[in-house]
């Protein structure tokens, strides 16, 4: 476990970070020699990383595996050994130049097939999504229609058959039309004779209605606070005594005459 951690740190620092900074310096200085050197290093290191993916799975149990890997990375990077340039010139460049046309043809075919597969996959995914949306919409519509039908049937069954009772407000009896009793011999829905057609309503046939009370206007705030002044009542005894006195005064005048 310790060797694995040390190996990962060595590969990260000496295999990636330092070569990346050195490549930046080569591009900035426009030194063709350094540029070619670091390009060869990155090609060899990419092949090493691809091979490491499989060797870590199958050969990691081999003793001193991580120590050999650290030593190999340092050998590639060292300016004294120049392991990256040596491997590139001896093995990588000849093999790539030998199979260059085949590699290019495979890349072109892979591009075309990947484009076609992406189009077909996109069409299939769109068709599947559209069919799923249509099925979901139909199912939801059917479920909603069934639910609405069940609710409507329940509502219709819950409506009572009894007529709604009418109520009369005793405060507004004058607004209502007085009802009259039908004449004697009247049959609802039947034909009336010639004698019954000429009959008129009599006064005693009208249903007596209670007397209508005039609506009293509500008192205002100022009127409710006023004090009602009443006139003093005149006594009947005083008026009669005045009449007797006038008669007594009138009698001596008659005697003198």
From Swiss-Prot:
Cysteines joined through disulfide linkages: none
A single MF term (Gene Ontology): microtubule binding
Keyword tags: Cell cycle, Cell division, Endoplasmic reticulum, Membrane, Microtubule, Mitosis, Phosphoprotein, Transmembrane, Transmembrane helix
Modified-residue entries (Phosphothreonine), positions: 196
GO CC terms of this entry: endoplasmic reticulum; endoplasmic reticulum membrane; microtubule
Membrane topology label: Multi-pass membrane protein
Modified residues (Phosphoserine): 152, 194, 202, 253
Subcellular location(s) of the protein: Endoplasmic reticulum membrane
Keyword Phosphoprotein: yes
A Pfam family annotated for this UniProt entry: TB2_DP1_HVA22
TM annotation in the entry: 1-21, 42-62
Stretches for region Disordered: 177-257
Biological process according to GO: cell division; mitotic nuclear membrane reassembly; nuclear envelope organization
Family of this protein: Belongs to the DP1 family.
Function: Microtubule-binding protein required to ensure proper cell division and nuclear envelope reassembly by sequestering the endoplasmic reticulum away from chromosomes during mitosis. Probably acts by clearing the endoplasmic reticulum membrane from metaphase chromosomes.
PANTHER family: HVA22-LIKE PROTEINS, RECEPTOR EXPRESSION-ENHANCING PROTEIN 4
Protein name: Receptor expression-enhancing protein 4
Organism: Mus musculus (Mouse)
Lineage of the organism: Eukaryota, Metazoa, Chordata, Craniata, Vertebrata
